[in-house]
């Protein structure tokens, strides 16, 4: 099995592709199949979130480009910017991962959120599309102010790979 543990910024060529939906692009340890059919193990730094277009380098030097897979999402539009901002506010208040486009919002399919959005008077359309939600205003993971008081203990990497 091919090991992939390095994210790189540039490459002169791409040797293979890795097509994954967003929920799998959030995992740092993952067993995957590349577009060529090659089985690989992602062993990335904890907290790494892959985005479409990211480049990875395998242990044998191959460069693999990440492709955001089409997945079931809801596309939200509104008659006015205020209505769209109101929908974004209510989704953000629920900590919903959200992709923000020019005049639209995109979120993972959820019938409860769809009903809420329709109740707000916006248009909601189910579609298959790549999902690239905002990374968050503060970057990284969820933290609290008291986290800085605790000693920093680096946990050893586990060898478990998600299927």
UniProtKB/Swiss-Prot annotation:
Identify the domain of life. Answer: Bacteria
Query: Which one of the record's GO molecular function terms can you name?
Result: nickel cation binding
Q: Where is this region: Disordered?
A: 134-163
- State the Pfam families in the record: UreE_C, UreE_N
Q: Which SMART domains match?
A: UreE_N
Q: Which InterPro entries match?
A: UreE, UreE_C_dom, UreE_N, UreE_N_sf
Mention any one GO cellular component term assigned to this protein in its UniProt record.
cytoplasm
Q: Which CDD domains match?
A: UreE (cd00571)
Q: Where in the cell is it found?
A: Cytoplasm
Keyword terms of this UniProt record = Chaperone, Cytoplasm, Nickel, Nickel insertion
Instruction: Name its GO BP terms in alphabetical order.
Output: protein folding; protein-containing complex assembly; urea metabolic process
Stated role: Involved in urease metallocenter assembly. Binds nickel. Probably functions as a nickel donor during metallocenter assembly.
Family from the record: Belongs to the UreE family.
What's the protein here called? Urease accessory protein UreE
- Which species is listed as the source? Methylobacillus flagellatus (strain ATCC 51484 / DSM 6875 / VKM B-1610 / KT)
What phylogenetic lineage does the species belong to? Bacteria, Pseudomonadati, Pseudomonadota, Betaproteobacteria, Nitrosomonadales
Its gene?
ureE
């Amino acid at each position: 099995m091919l090991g992939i543990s390095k994210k790189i910024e540039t490459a002169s060529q791409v040797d293979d592709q890795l097509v994954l939906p967003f929920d799998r692009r959030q995992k740092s340890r993952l067993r995957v199949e590349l577009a060529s059919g090659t089985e690989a193990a992602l062993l990335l730094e904890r907290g790494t979130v892959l985005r479409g277009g990211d480049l990875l380098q395998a242990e044998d030097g191959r460069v693999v480009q990440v492709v955001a897979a089409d997945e079931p999402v809801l596309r939200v539009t509104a008659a006015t910017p205020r209505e769209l901002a109101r929908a974004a506010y209510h989704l953000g208040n629920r900590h919903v991962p959200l992709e923000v486009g020019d005049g639209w919002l995109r979120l993972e399919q959820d019938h409860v959120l769809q009903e809420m959005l329709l109740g707000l008077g916006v248009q909601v359309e189910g579609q298959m599309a790549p999902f690239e939600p905002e990374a968050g205003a503060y970057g990284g993971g969820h933290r609290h102010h008291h986290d800085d008081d605790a000693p920093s203990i680096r946990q050893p990497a586990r060898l478990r790979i998600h299927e």
